[in-house]
Amino acid sequence: MQEQYRPDLIEADVQKYWAEKKTFKAVKDPSKEKYYCLSMFPYPSGRLHMGHVRNYTIGDVISRYQRMNGKNVLQPMGWDAFGLPAEGAAIKNKTAPAKWTYENIEYMKNQLKVLGFGFDWDREITTCKPEYYKWEQWFFTELYKKGLVYKKTSTVNWCPNDETVLANEQVHEGCCWRCDTPVEQKEIPQWFIKITDYAEQLLSDLDQLPEWPDMVKTMQRNWIGRSEGVEITFNVAHSDQTLTVYTTRPDTFYGVSYLAVAAAHPLAESAAKNNPELAAFIHEAKNTKVAEAELATMEKKGMATGLYAVHPMTGKQLPIWVANFVLMHYGTGAVMAVPAHDQRDYEFAQKYQLPLFPVIKPADNSAWDFSKQAYTEHGITINSAEFDGLDFEATFNGIADKLEKIGVGKRQVNYRLRDWGVSRQRYWGAPIPMLTLENGDVVVAPLQDLPIVLPEDVVMDGVKSPIKADPEWAKTTYNGQAALKETDTFDTFMESSWYYARYTSPQYQQAMLDADEANYWLPVDQYIGGIEHATMHLLYFRFFHKLLRDAGFVTSDEPSKKLLCQGMVLADAFYYTSPTNERIWVSPTKVTLERDEKGRIIKAVDDEGHELVHSGMTKMSKSKNNGIDPQEMVEKYGADTVRLFMMFASPAEMTLEWQESGVEGANRFLRRLWNLVFEYNQNPAQTALDPTALSVEQKALRRDVHKTIAKVSDDIGRRQTFNTAIAAIMELMNKLTKASLSNEQDRAVMAEALNAVVRMLYPITPHICFQLWQDLGNESTIDFAPWVIADAEAMVEDEKLVVIQVNGKVRAKVTVPADMSEDEIKQVALAEENVQKFLNGLTVVKTIYVQGKLFSFVAK
């Protein structure tokens, strides 16, 4: 055994061994319990960042731990390879997106290998390869045949100068990123998948996910947004038109004072025909892109249409307004406004002097000042004809019944969830497999024509997608007739919605999935990824699993049993202000720091002498130049050190603050472990451990070893508090470094302890443990060694320390045999001088005994 710990020598050798032996190759084995551990696959942006390293280290620790516990483990890896950044990089670097992507994959794959992750590389998936997206295209055609896919017009960002559609990321302050032309909102036909058909299942099946974080489930519940209400139809005065609204508050129906419609509502557009001012307002509102999240805070604007709706119960004429806070794609594109009981309606009414009719009062009869704000709680109904005096539920049902009876309303369950628009007017994505015939009919591309391959050898001009710019690409035939291929491509969330399932049979060519393999491995046992994916990817992932189930590929309802959302990685960020008043962010690796006695930064200077402002710990990002290159850290300290720091510095689901001092600490710990094994190896145990021949000290040390094993097993296996598991091992190591090695049983206890420590650390720091396991004289490799089991007998204590109290105050501490009875302990306590002193002259009225811990006298 080498005296010095040299990760640079060990790690490459161990990784080479794993690659040659295919140590982590997963093969279906019905006789073994499977464990499928999956971390969200990366977008091949060029380099791994610390967020990736954290995600994949957590997954690797869980995978290796489960393998040691006898499970048949699948841990695959691949590349979410389509997406907009490749187009931008291709234009900037004058290359094709495919070439840029494949080069990045090669580089990043090597980075993953250097970190020692135990992936089954034989199952690698690259989503931009035709053999992958062929089956996605086929599945889309099957969904179309089932009626789950349709085409409708939808709004996109449109650059009139380049005549192209822009992604949200390409719109900068309302203008095109390339030419600065003001961006318009344009309606174009797009493909949608009916996720709303599955809304109820997606909602109710959240109850089947007890091991998903509550926060993610709450976010999905809110995103799906189930509500119960009434759809009400108003007649438009002096016309045969009607206006339909949906409300969850029919109890406020008598308080409606106006109706508001979206700018794109047909009623608004017909009213604008002879009203140029209204037409201009509608044009402006349509071209202001508003995210739903911004609706609450933006300025409410509106204009009267001159039309009126008739209240079906009171006959009142209610003005119809166009309002910028009503969205056409949400509900019916029209709302009934009750300013007295809805704050948004209230603000709009105040601005445009519209009336307010209170119809609810607080249940406790307290007065409400409507001049200040709306009363939005449930309460007692007033000013509502025969419904006066009723509570919310009775009024809701009474008014809903009456609306249904007079034929203008129907009870309805609505969802906030919208259908999934999967069309993208981009090049670097999977082509949508639909054909348009010369007569205008739209048909699915037949299986024998799939995959519709995206050409990879293209030149990007930054304006038009190469497949849209080349009219020849779209030309094809269908049953002998001329046809045109769809030139839109899929939203890249399509690829990431089913990759987890394809990993179970990545080379299978007869179908999308091999059902036998899929049903052996699925559902995923442990999924790991960021909480930022809660309402997009994680919802589509669940939706796709239900589609695969209904297509007969899988039998389970949900794609993954357990979800862990790891926290972000933060680092110090520093900047100075340039002469042009621009913030120049400086990498922390180029900063010299001065700290006060509490470790706080008081001065920061970069290599060029600029005095820097420390803006605190923020998420590692390119924009703040505070990312730390994992590669550099591995070269400096070794992969095991980086992995150990990542798992120790913070609980997995909390943010992790990158501190190089912490990395150095992790490295020192591994050196101590190496040195301890080296020292032991100078004179190793020659005889086996004999538990009956141990001294008190040896028993105590062995007890600590087995208690640590029990804690670490629980922390990693059940609680997933990896940092506390490592802390327990470090605490044990402190005891081991002080332990005697003077006799044979000392060395036998140490041999057992070191073998246990190496096995416990193996999932976290596998390279050093691989080597130390051999150095400790084990014949087999540690990769297939079983997890260490705590010996219950070793943990039994011979003696207990019992605290003695008199009237709640500690007066003595006594060490007694562990099996001593309560009565015997009482006698020992009474024999203590200090106890006698405080009981002197008092009568004991009660004693309290807490098994093996506390004996208390209550005396008067």
UniProtKB/Swiss-Prot annotation:
Its main location: cytoplasm. Pfam families: Anticodon_1, tRNA-synt_1, tRNA-synt_1_2, tRNA-synt_1g. Transmembrane segments: none annotated. It catalyses: tRNA(Leu) + L-leucine + ATP = L-leucyl-tRNA(Leu) + AMP + diphosphate. A motif ('KMSKS' region) lies at residues 619-623. Signal peptide: none annotated. CDD domains: Anticodon_Ia_Leu_BEm, LeuRS_core. It is an enzyme of class 6 (ligase). ATP binds at residue 622. Its EC number is 6.1.1.4. It is found in: Cytoplasm. GO terms for molecular function: aminoacyl-tRNA deacylase activity; ATP binding; leucine-tRNA ligase activity. A motif ('HIGH' region) lies at residues 42-52. PROSITE patterns: AA_TRNA_LIGASE_I. Keywords: Aminoacyl-tRNA synthetase, ATP-binding, Cytoplasm, Ligase, Nucleotide-binding, Protein biosynthesis. PANTHER family: LEUCINE--TRNA LIGASE, MITOCHONDRIAL, LEUCYL-TRNA SYNTHETASE. This is Leucine--tRNA ligase. It comes from Histophilus somni (strain 129Pt). The lineage of its organism: Bacteria, Pseudomonadati, Pseudomonadota, Gammaproteobacteria, Pasteurellales. The gene is leuS.
